[in-house]
Curated annotation (Swiss-Prot):
Function text: Specifically methylates position 2 of adenine 2503 in 23S rRNA and position 2 of adenine 37 in tRNAs. m2A2503 modification seems to play a crucial role in the proofreading step occurring at the peptidyl transferase center and thus would serve to optimize ribosomal fidelity.
Reaction catalysis annotation: adenosine(2503) in 23S rRNA + 2 reduced [2Fe-2S]-[ferredoxin] + 2 S-adenosyl-L-methionine = 2-methyladenosine(2503) in 23S rRNA + 5'-deoxyadenosine + L-methionine + 2 oxidized [2Fe-2S]-[ferredoxin] + S-adenosyl-L-homocysteine; adenosine(37) in tRNA + 2 reduced [2Fe-2S]-[ferredoxin] + 2 S-adenosyl-L-methionine = 2-methyladenosine(37) in tRNA + 5'-deoxyadenosine + L-methionine + 2 oxidized [2Fe-2S]-[ferredoxin] + S-adenosyl-L-homocysteine
Gene: rlmN
Protein name as annotated: Dual-specificity RNA methyltransferase RlmN
Keyword Hydrolase: no
Cofactor annotation remark: Binds 1 [4Fe-4S] cluster. The cluster is coordinated with 3 cysteines and an exchangeable S-adenosyl-L-methionine.
Domain called Radical SAM core: residue spans: 100-339
Keywords from the UniProt entry: 4Fe-4S, Cytoplasm, Disulfide bond, Iron, Iron-sulfur, Metal-binding, Methyltransferase, rRNA processing, S-adenosyl-L-methionine, Transferase, tRNA processing
Active site positions: E94 (proton acceptor), C344 (s-methylcysteine intermediate)
Species this protein is from: Aliivibrio salmonicida (strain LFI1238)
Length: 383
């Protein structure tokens, strides 16, 4: 859908106030009122905003819109997990809702596809098209809240936690990630606690450096290997920023953060007979000895055509117990939504691939382990 109207979901509070002042000739408090309507009440109809005068409502209808991605398909798991295909332009990204008692976590995408080509991730096999806009990132939360039921309707928050662990690498979309995080944390936005918003990164050091001292949220890092040699084999980004550089930046961010309570969450996908033996566990413990961390082990979630397998329960248990001998807090992630391909590493969406990765795969050739031009992404030229 092509439109010349300005989508107000693309602005954080600072940007919305500037837009109201400079483009609409209105006072800042009007922007605050609109923001509250959008995020507290899930309102996308200016006529329903009854504390806004009619003249301004008419101006807003002429020049602006409130447009979030819409749900093109929904799949429901037996465990209560819901996976939505969210329409962004002519493509889809996937968003996952994971209820757990009084908590409800939303796994949000940051890109259409992913540029990083991690060999164990289904999203990576789809290739990459573009970064999501602010309205397409926060719009996933906005739409999910509408689908589940707004707090004013149900008496409980529809979303209590947000994890930037969907499709894409969040720190390759800094231009749109930062204002999106501001909206998630803002009392006039979604009003989430900084400890309940998690950004996960595969190791984009330049992006993490930009976050230091500017935004304080929970940090999770996708490590997945204890040595540079193995990590480079399964995660090509390691050739750009190796483990040492990555962990040094992580320690700097954690030192500046209150949200993380002094330690980072290390995500480690367990691939059968690839990175899951006791030597790997001991190497991982040695690697992390100077980085305060809790370790989240993720048994591999298979997807069609995957070259990897999930380890046996005994191998998972041995790996976990070896790490615990070094006094690490270790958890094994409980798989949710795997019956609808909504588990970690299984999200695919509908991607018009700019990397030709899918074309190569269809021709029966090995997918080249090559990064999309990261500089293009970091400069915000892949919108």
């Amino acid at each position: 859908m092509t439109t010349t109207k300005t989508n107000l979901l693309d602005f954080d509070r600072k940007g919305l106030r500037a837009f109201f002042s400079e483009e609409l000739g209105e006072k800042a408090f009007r922007a605050d009122q609109i923001m509250k309507w959008m995020y507290h009440f899930g309102c996308d109809d200016f006529d329903q905003m009854n504390n806004i005068n009619k003249k301004l409502r008419e101006k807003l209808k002429q020049k602006c819109e409130i447009r979030a991605p819409y749900v093109s398909e929904a799949q429901h798991s037996v465990d209560g997990t819901i996976k939505w295909a969210m329409k962004v332009g002519d493509q889809d990204v996937e968003t996952v809702y994971i209820p757990d008692g009084d908590r409800a976590t939303l796994c949000v995408s940051s890109q259409v596809g992913c540029a990083l080509a991690c060999t164990f991730c289904s999203t990576a096999q789809q290739g990459f098209n573009r970064n999501l806009k602010v309205s397409e990132i926060v719009g996933q939360i906005w739409r999910a809240a509408r689908e589940i039921g707004l707090e004013k309707e149900t008496g409980r928050r529809p979303i209590t936690n947000v994890v930037m662990m969907g499709m894409g690498e969040p720190l390759l979309n800094m231009k749109n990630l930062m204002p999106s995080l501001d909206i998630m944390l803002d009392d006039l936005g979604f009003g989430l606690s900084k400890r309940r918003v998690t950004v996960s990164t595969s190791g984009v050091v330049s992006g993490l450096e930009q976050m230091i001292g500017k935004v304080d949220v929970a940090l999770a890092i996708s490590l997945h290997a204890p040595t540079d040699k193995l990590r480079s084999e399964i995660m090509p980004i390691n050739d750009r920023w190796n483990i040492e550089a990555f962990l040094a930046c992580v320690r700097e961010y954690i030192a500046s953060s209150n949200a993380n309570r002094g330690r980072v969450t290390v995500e480690y996908v367990l691939l059968d007979h690839i990175n899951d033996d006791m030597d790997h566990a001991r190497q991982l413990a040695e690697l992390l000895k100077d980085t305060p961390a809790k370790i989240n082990l993720i048994p591999f979630n298979p997807y069609p055509g995957s070259p990897y397998k999930k380890p046996s329960n005994s191998r998972i248990d041995r790996f976990m117990k070896t790490l615990m001998e070094y006094d690490f807090t270790v958890t094994v992630r409980r798989t949710r939504g795997d019956d609808i391909d909504a588990a970690c590493g299984q999200l695919v969406g509908d991607v018009i691939d700019r990397t030709k990765r899918t074309q190569v795969k269809q021709q029966g050739e090995a997918i080249p382990v090559k990064l999309f031009n990261l500089d293009v992404l970091q400069q915000g030229k892949a919108e």
